[in-house]
């Protein structure tokens, strides 16, 4: 798989450059490898032949991220029937991911992306504003990836409660 590369012009980064590459329907998902909450290496290629719901969330155990993760957990039996694997990604460390998983009985891989490289590849890292301040962080995003690694649906700035319904909509469910 050919990874998507985000470039900086002349080694600088201004407001225009902060717009990361975004994925859209039909694009090849970038290949990646991250560590999950159990310390196990997980690669997107491990799921070849299955659909994958890949979603990015800002911080484990916050209200929106908990709502999003629990909605994915609650769709587990339906996802199993549809042969969809779920992968959550955040900049949190492995220990924080493990606590999040245990606290909410999520039982699907939560991947640690502390240097946000995978988030950048997917366009899920960008400028955010809170209380009048600008900073870089995770843009809550989700992607439905088909069995061959192609994007079936991409949602940026998705509301936590819409992650599962939007994925199901693409599948006609």
Could you tell me what each predicted segment is?
Residues 3-6, 16-173:
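Chalcogenol-based redox active-site neighborhoods
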